[in-house]
Amino acid sequence: MEPSFAPYAAHSSQTRGRVHREAPAAPRSEFQRDRDRIIHSTAFRRLEYKTQVFVNHEGDLFRTRLTHSIEVAQIGRTIARLLNLNEDLVEAVALAHDLGHTPFGHAGQDALNACMREHGGFEHNLQSLRVVDLLEERYAEFDGLNLTFEAREGILKHCALSNAEKLGEVGRRFIDKKQPSLEAQVANLADEIAYNNHDVDDGLRSGLITLEQLSEVTIFGRHLAEVRRKHPTLQGRRVVTETVRRIINALILDLVDTTRTNVVNSGVETLDDVRNAPPLAAFSPAILEQHRELKRFLLHHLYRHYKVARMSTKAGRIISDLYAAFTGDARLLPPEHQARESLEGTRAVADYIAGMTDRYAMREHRRIYAVEEIYD
């Protein structure tokens, strides 16, 4: 039995269903079932060894795609509860949103997209959908995880029109310029809250950015000053974690207040109303600008730091080399991927590379290109 949600929330009892029909899984709701399938998937476990910003072996305490996804789910559930939305759907979308991400973060994605430019490109959101629709191999009756329509549309955050046209119903909203459920919108913004603030935390831990630099950023400086005023003797990591905690809380509360106002002003009463309205989940204009200022700071001072740039260059080289090797000679692929390559060509190669963890990609690169490992 589902809790009582807002009338415009997504109710699993009213789901638009799964591609392959299945009997109900009582006592779980359909969205709980989605979440459980995602958690038990191979792709979800691989996220433990996929980069957020820093390559996994650079340090044990830096975030990975797995810890990031868990943090997004936690933030998303908090927002959903405050807005009386379906927490299970928000959690499912949050946990699955990065399943299609390449090794080495955005550097890996950019490199693979460049390799696939003449073959449809590579979008990690589209790849996440491909993972849950096709690539996971767990069930006797179907490929993929056979998730509900609502979970699948939430995973597909962005999609080029050329690709949307090939996806049928789940890609239709990009063509019709409609919105996904509020739960999907919340999961998207929870992702932004999580990665900005946790990249701040990891950036400070790495020493690539400093508190002094961040104090010039409006939203961080304001909360840092509050922490120092309230806890004048606080030192070290506790200053950072207390500041980041306060920023996350402030962003959540602003998002909830602004979204509530948007819902009231728009007059939405049903999920269909949500789909036909402008985006409803949002930050206030003032907080949105402060959030963007923080993103700009991270872009210039962390993501473009020369040490991160060096890691990104190496990562791009590994991905490009692997793609060249596998498309140049399919015999270098493992047997099961050779079979898929003979049917799907370069897309099967992209699937194989995108599914690698950071360390597996580095190992495969050494096996193919390092002459000292000729017998590996």
UniProtKB/Swiss-Prot annotation:
Segments forming domain HD: 65-196
Chain intervals for the UniProt region annotation (Disordered): 1-32
Top-level taxon of origin: Bacteria
One GO MF term attached to the UniProt entry: dGTPase activity
A Pfam family that the UniProt record links to this protein: HD
GO terms of biological process kind: dGTP catabolic process
Hydrolase keyword on record: yes
Disulfide cross-links: none
Keywords linked to the UniProt accession: Hydrolase
NCBIfam families: dGTP_triPase (TIGR01353), PRK01286.1-1 (NF002326)
Protein family: Belongs to the dGTPase family. Type 2 subfamily.
PANTHER family: DEOXYGUANOSINETRIPHOSPHATE TRIPHOSPHOHYDROLASE-LIKE PROTEIN, DEOXYNUCLEOSIDE TRIPHOSPHATE TRIPHOSPHOHYDROLASE
Name of the protein described by the UniProt record: Deoxyguanosinetriphosphate triphosphohydrolase-like protein
Organism of this sequence: Thiobacillus denitrificans (strain ATCC 25259 / T1)
